[in-house]
Amino acid sequence: MAQPVHSLCSAFGLQCCLLFLLASWGAGATTFQEYQKTGELSTSDHIFPLTPGLVYSIPFDHIVLHSGQRPPELPKSTEIHEQKRHCNTTRHSKPTDKPTGNSKTIDHKSSTDNHEAPPTSEENSSNQGKDPMIRNQRSVDPADSTTTHKESAGKKHITPAPKSKINCRKSTTGKSTVTRKSDKTGRPLEKSMSTLDKTSTSSHKTTTSFHNSGNSQTKQKSTSFPEKITAASKTTYKTTGTPEESEKTEDSRTTVASDKLLTKTTKNIQETISANELTQSLAEPTEHGGRTANENNTPSPAEPTENRERTANENKKTICTKGKNTPVPEKPTENLGNTTLTTETIKAPVKSTENPEKTAAVTKTIKPSVKVTGDKSLTTTSSHLNKTEVTHQVPTGSFTLITSRTKLSSITSEATGNESHPYLNKDGSQKGIHAGQMGENDSFPAWAIVIVVLVAVILLLVFLGLIFLVSYMMRTRRTLTQNTQYNDAEDEGGPNSYPVYLMEQQNLGMGQIPSPR
């Protein structure tokens, strides 16, 4: 009886061991695949360090088609020609109707590549040398985004189609997005904004030099406010990095001129009128003059109607993604003492839908808690300024999106990096590289599954061992009990159970008992 039970237990134990080995092998294969995916993610993160979502690349070469002026120069870096891209980007593109003056704009762009702002070039190079952006334990200089924008400006005659391939060294990813984990940067958004408020006063005059190249109106009070320009770029990055819009529109996506400005356009044509009404329903503080923004109506290139509708929809999307849209007060000195909340002002002229040849400055600003007098302006630069540090303008018909940014320190770039992390984590259904990360967030990681399987197998084996031990002890005890009962019965009823000496004494008399001699 004991041998069949023992053989059954041994066979069951061998089967459990085989199952455990198979589970461990499968978990190891899954871990290896995830490790390869992680390697691909790190490679793509090194290549595209600033892309929170894939967007249309809208170069700013459209600015000066009819004005005959030079576009503003991108910030120069000492490592522009040293850092090489490791990926070949091939875009499947289809030609659309573009004005014939684009070649002229490219010539203007190439002629102004070596033009620098005298007061700010040394500061920019020193800031770029000392404060590179650190994301995912890598040092990434903003020159990569500058070279990316130059390549996109060179391909200006072709509008990118909804598909793009990026052929890297080891893998091919469909979209050039970057996954970042929010626990590596160590600063939430609120801390980074408050730190920006502290550091913006120290670098109060970073971009104060502007060269007028033909229009002296646009130099009105556009100096000594780099902290507001930086705050404006932060707002633009927050509103345009929404992953929900990147799910809905299959756009070809790439980085733009600055490392913190991304412009998202969609193809929803039906929302144009509502976008115009929503933009006009906000505050229009035109009485500020030079206090609020330099609003310039300049002739823009004759774009197709689709571009106009895209930009209108873009303005609506920008408004919808921002949770708090409040108009700018008439005096900038009000409500600046105790708050770090962001306010956005999106201004559109009254005749923006009637005259498509005019453009209006759509301005976004963040008010940090810095004492600002009423005479100073919330500066955004227009297309007539020859030099700011970075100016990105998107003229598409009836609207023009003007955003600016200046680099104060590495804290600003870290704050911008922190803003993109929640969007990346929320994007559960985004295709491409985010699938592996969201798969890990939605389910248990492989090592946890392996540990659970190991613990379950060990507990099962211990339980089976206890059952086997109890059954064996019961059988042994039963055998011992039977042997004991048999021995006792034999001692009591056997022929040698009563002593012979006593029997002889009872049967024989005392005289018959032989006495020992």
Swiss-Prot record:
Residues annotated as transmembrane: 449-469
Biased composition (Basic residues): 83-93
Biased composition (Polar residues): 169-179, 214-225, 232-243, 263-283
Biased composition (Basic and acidic residues): 105-116, 180-190, 305-317
Chief subcellular location: membrane
Membrane topology classification: Single-pass type I membrane protein
Cytoplasmic membrane side: 470-517
Residues annotated as glycosylated: 88, 124, 338
Residues in the signal sequence: 1-29
Keyword list, A-Z: Cell membrane, Cytoplasm, Glycoprotein, Membrane, Signal, Transmembrane, Transmembrane helix
One CC-aspect GO term: plasma membrane
InterPro entries: MUCL3 (IPR026623)
Positions on the Extracellular side per record topology: 30-448
Listed Low complexity bias regions: 194-213
Biological role: May modulate NF-kappaB signaling and play a role in cell growth.
PANTHER family: DIFFUSE PANBRONCHIOLITIS CRITICAL REGION GENE 1, MUCIN-LIKE PROTEIN 3
Protein name listed in UniProt: Mucin-like protein 3
Species this chain originates from: Homo sapiens (Human)
